[in-house]
């Protein structure tokens, strides 16, 4: 079984009414642990690699490790670039054989976010790769992504339809109050489920991604599943 795209996964998740966990990896031991858990649950997996992990471990090594995980487990596994901060980085990941990439241009003005995301989408789709983008900014420190609580902002549901339509993106990460990296365990997250609900109404059956899920309580994960969300790292 080859690596799969997240697009295939999300379609099946909607049919089955479940979310999919995405887990950051940077070495063999981490990949083995995640895959063993996946085998026990017979769950599809998104194994994602950050910019820092690519610099640390070499994307070729990581790709071969993930391919070995597919061969060993027989599970549907996607290899995803997490928080790609430029067209060049996303292009490099696509050329390296990643089946999914995230372009995070959420720090840019809305129009510029659309422009950069559209460029990535064109190159990715030409190569059979799917794209995740982000609207709104999550608080947190992860690799070179650093957004303070003061600069974090919720996603504006009024922008999501235009953004998806103009970019052709395959999934959308939104900000509803989760945080990632060094901020993720600083108190119980105050999640704006009203934003999640409104986005799901405006984008019916469209894959929604929530980052920073490690500290989200199980009851909240159940609610997020109801709205078709995927939660990287969800417990």
Language model regions located:
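Alpha/beta enzyme core
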Residues: 4-12, 27-53, 60-76, 84-207, ...
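Terminal accessory/targeting
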Residues: 5, 14-22
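Conserved residues at beta->alpha junctions
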Residues: 24-25, 212
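Short acidic/histidine-rich active-site segments
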Residues: 212-215, 234-235
């Amino acid at each position: 079984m080859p690596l799969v795209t997240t697009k295939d996964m999300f379609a099946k998740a909607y049919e089955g009414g479940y979310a999919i966990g995405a887990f950051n990896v940077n070495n063999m031991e981490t990949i083995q642990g995640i895959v063993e858990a996946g085998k026990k649950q017979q769950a599809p997996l998104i194994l994602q690699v950050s910019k820092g992990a690519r610099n640390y471990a070499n994307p070729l090594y990581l790709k071969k490790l993930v391919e070995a995980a597919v061969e060993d487990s027989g599970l549907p596994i996607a290899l995803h670039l997490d928080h790609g901060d430029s067209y060049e980085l996303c292009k490099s990941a696509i050329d390296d054989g990643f089946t999914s990439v995230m372009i995070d241009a959420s720090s840019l003005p809305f129009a510029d976010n659309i422009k950069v995301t559209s460029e990535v989408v064109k190159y990715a789709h030409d190569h059979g790769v799917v794209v995740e983008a982000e609207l709104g900014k999550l608080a947190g420190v992860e690799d070179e992504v650093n957004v303070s609580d003061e600069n974090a902002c919720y996603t504006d549901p009024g922008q999501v339809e235009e953004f998806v339509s103009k970019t052709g993106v395959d999934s959308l990460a939104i900000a509803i109050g989760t945080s990632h990296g060094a901020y993720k365990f600083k108190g119980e997250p105050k999640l704006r489920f009203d934003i999640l609900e409104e986005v799901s109404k405006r984008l019916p059956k469209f894959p929604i991604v929530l980052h920073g899920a490690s500290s989200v309580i199980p009851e909240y994960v159940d609610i997020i599943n109801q709205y078709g969300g995927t939660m990287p790292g969800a417990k």
